[in-house]
A protein has these predicted regions:
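DNA-contacting interfaces and partner/effector-binding or oligomerization modules
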Residues: 1-2, 30
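Ferredoxin-like iron-sulfur electron-transfer modules
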Residues: 3-23, 41-64, 83-107, 124-148, ...
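Iron-sulfur cluster-binding cysteine motifs and their immediate structural context
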Residues: 26-44, 67-85, 110-127, 151-166, ...
Length: 342
């Protein structure tokens, strides 16, 4: 697993494990020095930019207090002393009860089918050889990748799986602001958001929330390019040392993402089709005609516009770093590149 050394001081190291990170921003929210930065969450989740969810400033203000590591639900941040990670009852990831499978398991594979992180597998699955009508095998959960969403337990027909969520909370999406860009759907680590399939002329929600799967991490909020989503953490569920103090800090408004990417355009490759202008959720929020997919008036937009047959960036600062433009471009003429954090 890839490791990023964020800072080293004497025999202590601040280490980031990007493959475990879900882009929730809890670490950024709780950092007392503002040393951690989150940005381009949607683009990172979609695999459309070469960067990680989290970066660290180089101001030297970090005091290695370990608060960021303590609230990380997946163990993506570590404070190490002499190379050994600090893990005790004051760390949320260590306090979380592991997702486990007991002897009631019939190895049916439903949990494998629904796991959003593909961290469950069944080994040596075969019909029992004792004459009974049952399956034998081993159902294995990779705890390093499990996000404790509970999908597996919810679909298990025998109640063989136990789990514990990291947070309790509330989810709110403003339908008047949401542009149905699907950035939140692609980002959610728990598959708790989806788009319903509607029939002709049927009114359906732009995005539907699966409450029972949500872990209230806040990754969707960090990813939304138009700030249509608010996730609040009301409680830390596992018993852990210093829980009340951490809950108080996490009850504050979540940290807003930093612009950690920059839009790039290949003018020679651009067809001037305007697909990116129409699909851009920031543009669509500004202009309801674009949200309806109208192909006219492709100039005078807040972020992207077509001028003289070529797309151009109007204002980098309003970009939500979702990379929807990059996804829809038929000529690969627009993309996001990493922007250095001061």
């Amino acid at each position: 697993m890839r490791e990023v050394l964020l800072e080293s001081r004497d025999d202590r190291q601040h280490v980031y494990l990007p493959e475990k990170c879900i882009g929730c921003g809890s670490c950024v929210q709780i950092c007392p020095k503002g040393e951690l930065v989150i940005g381009s969450v949607g683009a990172v989740a979609r695999g459309l930019i070469d960067k990680d969810f989290i970066e660290k400033k180089r101001s030297g203000a970090c005091v290695l207090c370990a608060l960021c590591a303590r609230v990380c639900p997946t163990g993506a941040l570590e404070l190490r002393t002499a190379g050994k990670a600090e893990k005790d009852e004051s760390y949320l990831n260590a306090a979380l009860q592991p997702t486990t499978v007991n002897d009631k398991c019939v190895h049916c594979g439903l949990c494998v089918d629904v796991c959003p992180k593909s961290c469950i597998e069944i080994l040596d699955r075969q019909l029992a050889e004792d004459g009974s009508l049952r399956m034998e095998g081993k159902t294995i959960i990779d705890l390093a990748r499990c996000v404790h969403c509970g999908w597996c337990a919810q679909v298990c027909p025998t109640g063989a799986i136990t789990y514990q969520k990291p947070f309790a909370g509330q989810f709110f999406r403003d339908d008047n602001i949401c542009q149905a860009c699907r950035t939140c759907v692609h980002t959610c680590p728990a598959n708790a958001l989806f788009n319903k399939e509607g029939k002709a002329a049927e009114m359906v929600e732009k995005v539907t929330h699966r409450k029972d799967a949500c872990i209230y991490c806040g990754a969707c909020q960090e990813a939304c390019p138009v700030r249509a989503i608010t996730v609040s953490k009301s409680a830390i569920i596992p018993d852990m040392k210093g829980k009340k103090a951490l809950e108080k800090k996490l009850s504050a408004p979540a940290a807003r993402p930093t612009l950690t990417s920059i839009l790039k355009i290949d003018e020679d490759a651009c067809l001037g089709c305007g697909n990116c202008v129409i699909a851009c959720p920031v543009n669509a929020l500004f202009d309801p005609y674009l949200a309806a997919g109208h192909l006219n008036e492709l100039d005078e937009k807040p972020l992207l516009e077509v001028l003289n047959g070529t797309v151009r960036v109007v204002d980098q600062q309003v970009c939500g770093s979702c990379a929807t433009c990059s996804m829809i471009c038929p000529a690969a003429a627009i993309w996001l590149e990493r922007r250095e954090v001061a």
